UniProtKB/Swiss-Prot annotation:
NCBIfam families assigned: rplP_bact
Protein name (Swiss-Prot/TrEMBL): Large ribosomal subunit protein uL16c
Alphabetized CDD domains for the sequence: Ribosomal_L16_L10e (cd01433)
Phosphoprotein found in the keyword field: no
Subcellular location(s) per record: Plastid, Chloroplast
Source species: Welwitschia mirabilis
MF (Gene Ontology): rRNA binding; structural constituent of ribosome
Signal peptide start and end residues: none
Keywords: Chloroplast, Plastid, Ribonucleoprotein, Ribosomal protein
Pfam family, one: Ribosomal_L16
Biological processes per GO annotation: mitochondrial translation
């Protein structure tokens, strides 16, 4: 699972998901891509599940580029804790995704294989996605 090696601060504000993606929205590395159409937080587990799905479906010859990184810590308090006494401890990491952001890029396989992989990965993501090709 992906997570930063070191951060300047342990905890972050929640923030808001508004606007569209202005960076990371063009195909650079591969021939095909999966693009987000809605704002969402994508966990490191979801990113890894998508990567494993793509490599499993396409078998040999595929090259996958993960175009997002989970760099936002999400904190949680345990269930039996009373209110107050500060913010909880970081439990997992998410990537903040805005509409238009590329999630994965693929290359080295025919379009029908890449399209099938993208369709199955879309079920594992928490937002609507679409398939792009150059």
């Amino acid at each position: 699972m992906l997570s930063p090696k070191k951060t300047k601060f342990r905890k972050q504000h929640k923030g808001r998901l508004k606007g569209v993606c202005s960076r990371g929205n063009r195909i650079i590395f591969g021939k095909f891509a999966i693009q987000a159409l809605e704002p969402a937080w994508v966990t490191s587990g979801q990113i890894e599940a998508g990567r494993r799905t793509i490599t499993r479906i396409a078998r040999r010859g595929i090259k996958v580029w993960i175009r997002l990184f989970p760099d936002k810590p999400i904190t949680k308090k345990s269930a039996d804790t009373r209110m107050g006494s500060g913010k909880g401890d970081p439990k997992f990491w998410v990537a903040v995704v805005k509409p238009g952001r590329l999630l994965y890029e693929m290359g080295g396989v025919p379009e029908n294989v890449a399209r099938k992989a993208a369709q199955i990965v879309a079920y594992k993501m928490c937002m609507r996605t679409r398939f792009l090709k150059t």
